[in-house]
């Protein structure tokens, strides 16, 4: 079985699994492009028969999607160490290290994923766990059954609240609830200012905002990157704990409802966003948009603006189509 450990301070995800095979056999499976493509279920972008070396391309496309990771081999020390970048095409890139050690029962593989600032550790950990079981199957072993969603949620509980950045979708009757939980290292009063004032909103939402700070007040946004506007109604205004408003003209043709909830946390503020959507709405689009924008709230609380990054937003769309 795979053991997974997450370090919030170092932003590393480490997975360890033992294989009852000689180190050379396991190395061939993790360091040969054709073998990698087979057990990872990806399309290798390049010559599958090529021999990897330091500086070589390490590019592949995830099957049944157009999501690509463009990368390079950073260290190559057979049969013990392979280190490569990951998603250089979507800054900031990550780094993945494969370390193989000989043990009495065969080979111990330790995979360390050095996460960029905005990566989701539970989702990434569950994905790697499944892939390490697929590696076992490719070596002729019986893989352990893994439920990806259940494992992701288990890792979320184990890794702690700062590790989770993805939204979660649940359904209630003819509605669907998109929920994000974020831990922000700022007091609730500072986060409230970021969420509810034109100056604060402009830093993380890339929008010009007009807000009447009262229940029933007008809430207007003009999204600068898209030259598009929306006008809703403030439904809840309870500083510094709850701020809600309607989101009009969804694809389903009816209003949806957004609620921000803030509560003190030992690290600062626990921010929860709940977007109550009609069943017909495209939750994937909202998930990608909220995810990207919430990533900018921390900088906004420090007075910094976040420029629009369409490339990352499109990658998040692809991720949520696979995982939401």
Task: Describe the function of each predicted region.
Residues 30, 40, 86, 139, ...:
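Short, flexible helix/strand-to-coil boundary loops that buttress conserved ligand/catalytic motifs
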Residues 9, 76-78, 103-105, 185, ...:
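Structural motif
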Residues 65, 90-92, 119, 210-211, ...:
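Short glycine/serine/proline-enriched coil/turn segments at secondary-structure junctions
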Residues 17, 70-75, 87, 95-102, ...:
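Hydrophobic/aromatic beta-strand elements that line small-molecule binding cavities or substrate pockets
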Residues 14-15, 21, 25, 33-72, ...:
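Short beta-edge strand/loop motif at the mouth of beta-sheet-based domains
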Residues 2-8, 104-177, 181-184, 266-324:
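Terminal "cap-and-tail" regions of soluble proteins that handle hydrophobic small molecules
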Residues 57-63, 83-89, 111-113, 219-224, ...:
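Short beta-strand segments that buttress and anchor functional surface loops
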């Amino acid at each position: 079985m795979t053991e997974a450990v997450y370090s919030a301070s170092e932003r590393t995800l480490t997975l360890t699994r033992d294989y009852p095979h000689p180190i050379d056999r396991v190395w061939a499976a993790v360091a040969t492009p054709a073998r990698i493509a087979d057990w990872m279920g990806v399309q290798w972008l390049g010559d599958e028969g090529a021999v990897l070396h330091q500086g070589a391309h390490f590019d592949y496309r995830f099957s049944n999607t157009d999501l690509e990771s463009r990368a390079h081999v950073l260290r190559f020390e057979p049969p013990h160490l392979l280190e490569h970048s990951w998603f250089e095409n979507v800054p900031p890139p990550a780094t993945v290290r494969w370390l193989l050690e000989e043990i009495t029962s065969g080979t111990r593989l330790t995979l360390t994923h050095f996460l960029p600032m905005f990566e989701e550790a539970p989702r990434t950990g569950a994905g790697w766990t499944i892939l390490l079981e697929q590696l076992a199957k490719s070596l002729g072993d019986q893989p352990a059954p893994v439920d990806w969603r259940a494992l992701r949620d288990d890792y979320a509980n184990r890794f702690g609240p700062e590790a989770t950045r993805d939204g979660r979708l649940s359904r209630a009757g003819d509605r669907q609830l998109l929920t994000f939980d974020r831990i922000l290292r700022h007091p609730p009063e500072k986060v409230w200012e970021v969420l509810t004032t034109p100056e604060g909103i402009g830093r993380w939402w890339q929008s010009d905002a007009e807000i009447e700070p009262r229940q029933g007040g007008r809430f207007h946004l003009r999204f600068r990157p898209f030259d598009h506007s929306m006008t809703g109604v403030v439904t809840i205004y309870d500083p510094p704990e709850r701020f809600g408003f309607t989101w009009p003209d969804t694809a389903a043709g009816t209003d949806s409802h957004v609620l921000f909830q803030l509560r003190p946390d030992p690290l600062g503020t626990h921010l929860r966003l709940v977007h109550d959507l009609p069943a017909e709405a495209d939750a994937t689009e909202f998930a990608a948009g909220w995810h990207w924008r919430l990533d900018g709230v921390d900088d906004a609380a420090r007075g910094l603006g976040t420029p629009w990054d369409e490339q990352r937003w499109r990658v998040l769309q692809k991720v949520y189509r696979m995982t939401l």
